[in-house]
Amino acid sequence: MSQTSLQPVHVVGGGLAGSEAAFQLAERGVPVVLHEMRPVRGTEAHHTDGLAELVCSNSFRSDDAQTNAVGVLHAEMRRAGSLILRCADANQVPAGGALAVDRDGFSQAVTAALAEHPLVEIRREEVTAIPPEEWDNVIIATGPLTSPALAQAVLELTGESALAFFDAIAPIVHLDSIDLSKAWFQSRYDKVGPGGTGADYINCPLDKEQYEAFVDALLASEKVPLRDFEAKTPYFDGCLPIEVMAERGRETLRFGPLKPVGLTNPHNPDVKPHAVIQLRQDNKLGTLYNLVGFQTKMRHGEQVRVFRTIPGLENAEFARLGGLHRNTYLNSPRLLDGTLRLKAAPRLRFAGQITGCEGYVESAAVGLMAGRFAAAERRGEALVPPPATTAHGALLAHITGGHIETVDAGPRSFQPMNVNFGLFPQLDVSPKGADGKRLRGSEKTLAKKRLLAERALSDMSAWLDTPAAAA
């Protein structure tokens, strides 16, 4: 099919995801109209009208493709011909093992690449409503600062009750870093919920002295100040930061998320805990657990320090630390299909942070997939998602259905997530040392990461070599 006979795909939003999606489409011979509202309408966080402007950090995080999940994502994106990674590499600044960029040079490079592409038209205009029906193939990549008018239009189309709010993020811990000689599995009152066993939570007990010390640590910890535009956004219902609850009274937590009722510590069954911190399974693979009720605005270093004082979490490895900030994202597992299309209106795809991924690289990766899916659809080709064993596939699985929704967490338990090895399907066999013996501790963790990374990159290369993906 000649490219001149193809109708354009419309991409709404010129951030990391939208820019990557537009490039992937154009590189596959599909004309693109990229709609970016800046400078016609600005946001509280952007300072330029450049495409792919980095509004916070200039770091794309670790570039280690052997033992770090985001480094694996970098490597996969490079193999897939990512514009964002190409421009990041070209504008790299020294940052140790991380990939950091000159933010202005990076944005200028992305803008130039798209402006100069013969199949890309950039329109500087705000899209304030669901695109018209004649736009039969659309990618909405409007990010965490989606304009109010478009956000309201999406709400009305999906029937969701909330789209923009203060996003409460609880810390997530790798299961294999929790000390189960101190913690234990049990649901409150041994209650068996849907799909549960009555032992669905991990419980970490605190005696009175430990509880008082924990409250003191929360109150004394250093917090992240809210930016001006965030201060105007109300808290999401039921998502007060844990340190704010502690400020309301020293016993507040013990009668709230840390209540000890209905639980018996099998390691010390004759002593009732003064308080109990619970962790709930966070992914279907059962490799990640989140700290229930622990949304927080403590600085990341403080979170690690304070949370590792909890019995059983002394050596906790965090897949994600907690946070509280203004965000706009969909309840994607319920609303999107496996190729990021809106179930209620399949001509619309979503990409980037609005889908519930977290981070620059993750946003661009979802844009890359959305662009490839939209191109395949426009060209009449099969839509083949990347394998779940790849970083891209693991991220896609989380967004479109990998997150557990629990009854007690309410109707909106899906939360944004950075890519991490806890999202990957686990290995069939445990890693072994050169002597054939099973590895333990940190050696096992490192070997496991290496094997997951090797598998991901191998499977990504195989996927890219398939006719549908390579087209």
Curated annotation (Swiss-Prot):
Record Pfam families: GIDA (PF01134)
Keywords in alphabetical order: Cytoplasm, FAD, Flavoprotein, Methyltransferase, NAD, NADP, Transferase, tRNA processing
The protein's required cofactors: FAD
Binding site for FAD: 13-18
Gene Ontology BP annotations: tRNA methylation; tRNA wobble uridine modification
GO molecular function, one term: tRNA (uracil(54)-C5)-methyltransferase activity, 5,10-methylenetetrahydrofolate-dependent
Residues passing through the membrane, by range: none
GO cellular component annotations of the record: cytosol
Chief location: cytoplasm
EC number per UniProt: 2.1.1.74
Localization: Cytoplasm
Record-linked InterPro entries: FAD/NAD-bd_sf, MnmG-rel, MnmG-rel_CS, MnmG_N, TrmFO
PROSITE patterns linked: GIDA_2
Protein role: Catalyzes the folate-dependent formation of 5-methyl-uridine at position 54 (M-5-U54) in all tRNAs.
Family: Belongs to the MnmG family. TrmFO subfamily.
Name of the featured protein: Methylenetetrahydrofolate--tRNA-(uracil-5-)-methyltransferase TrmFO
Species annotation: Azorhizobium caulinodans (strain ATCC 43989 / DSM 5975 / JCM 20966 / LMG 6465 / NBRC 14845 / NCIMB 13405 / ORS 571)
